[in-house]
Amino acid sequence: MHEMSLCEGIRGIVGDQARRHGFATVKVLRLEIGRFAGVEKAALGFAFDVVMRGSAAEGARLEILDLPGRALCYDCGEEAAIEDRFDPCPLCGGGRLMPVGGDEMRIKDMEVQ
């Protein structure tokens, strides 16, 4: 379960930010996760609760914001949202697409005190 190691990375970032900005508690942590990031959200939620014990984010509410998949179509030159990596271009039906978004995961923001 790589979600555990993802949460360990989040814990490190939270700790760094707590020291840098002087907060003691994270109330809400918002993550943006792309459609193609390969993250199992239920497993991430479980791992988050376990890994954050003893940190500034212990007991924090985790909110996950879904980011769409995006691709550049080499046939029409446009960028469009796609549901699956192998979908045709929704604008022109072309099949030569390069994914340009949807594989990211990042902390959007935190509510702290």
Curated annotation (Swiss-Prot):
Give the record's keywords alphabetically: Metal-binding, Nickel, Zinc
Protein name stated in the entry:
Hydrogenase maturation factor HypA
Q: What is the lineage of its organism?
A: Bacteria, Pseudomonadati, Pseudomonadota, Alphaproteobacteria, Rhodobacterales
Q: Which residues bind Zn(2+)?
A: C73, C76, C89, C92
- Is Zinc included in the keywords of this UniProt record? yes
* Residues involved in Ni(2+) binding: H2
Function, as annotated, reads: Involved in the maturation of [NiFe] hydrogenases. Required for nickel insertion into the metal center of the hydrogenase.
Q: Would you identify the family this protein belongs to, as annotated? A: Belongs to the HypA/HybF family.
Pfam families for this protein: HypA
Q: Specify the superkingdom.
A: Bacteria
Q: Does the keyword Metal-binding apply?
A: yes
Give the Gene Ontology MF terms in alphabetical order: nickel cation binding; zinc ion binding
